[in-house]
Amino acid sequence: CDAISREVTSYSALRPEDYLNGFEPDAAAKQRDVAEPHPWRRYFARGIDLALVGLPVSFVQYVLLHRNYTTVSRWEDIVCALIGWGLLLLLEPLLLARFGTTAGKWCMGITVTRPDGERLSYSEALNRTALVWFYGAGLGLPLVELVCSYLSYRRYTRGEELAWEEGSVERFDGRGTGKMALLCAASWAVCGTLTVAMALAAMLPPNRGDLTVAEFAENVNFYRDFFDYGERWSLDENGEWAENQYENVVYFGGGDGPAPFTYTVEDGTLRAVHWAYTETAETIYGTGDENARMAYLALAAAQKGTSLFNIRSVVKQIGSNSWEGDADYSAAWKNVEMRYDARIKGEYYYGEGFFLSMQDGQPITVTLTFDARLAE
């Protein structure tokens, strides 16, 4: 003020910009004026967006590819997560450029703009999302993502600019915590419910209702693949075992194939399935009792009234905790009745289809029979 009074002789001669430009702006204060740190709002917004882009990934994984969620490997989870980030890289820039927000950010009351309040261009939004993926999420890799998230949290809460924030500002509205919690919980509940529904739908067989032998065979092949029982053998349209041939694949042993099924058919409709296995040896590998399990599931899960809401109940019936391969077992589902009988002569040890004689030099005889039929 003293300088102005000395140097300016009249109000009309005053040029305020000459004096204002001499001040150094406080970058940290400027950042606080734009938006106070809200790390958890940003974190949950990102989580909602990732959950949403995970839905089409789950659709392909379960509905189209019929993957068994109980046997999905950690590597497959990582690949699916990377695909989800890839979708986010495609979709988020479009949403930011068009609306200034995403579904997750909207739930948390966040908009992303340029410092002047204008929306980002597509290229600016794409660059921002790519930097979030690289620096903030560590390319979506386990452990790396955890470390990057922690470091970003520390920088952000100290008021430092994050790698992807240059040229953009996140603005937060004044909505209450209750509203955000409700929207966040609802979003995750919807995503979780849809994902579980798709995983359960993957268990349903391709053919439903009254089955022909060919349709039954297709169901058996479906479940053998679903439960990863090998690709060497499959049932043909006549319900007989056929050895699959693959380029550069040579099989050793087991050339006779699994024990065959026999069928009872009335007016073209499959009414009953029968299976029997017998062998005498000191060591018996692979009785093929899993095929009896798949046969029951192929017939039972096809019945009217079986849906994604109860498919787990019939699948549980064939689990090793319920159906032990060396013991008699019976089950029923809808109008399908099944009986499995196991007769073993001699002292033995059993484990997952493997029989071992406990008497040196003395063989055991294993006889297994299976019958599944539609109730009259």
Locate the predicted segments by residue.
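Extracytoplasmic/periplasmic C-terminal soluble domains
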Residues: 311-376
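Surface-exposed amphipathic alpha-helical segments
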Residues: 294-305
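Membrane-interfacial and juxtamembrane segments of integral membrane proteins
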Residues: 3-291, 305-317, 327, 332, ...
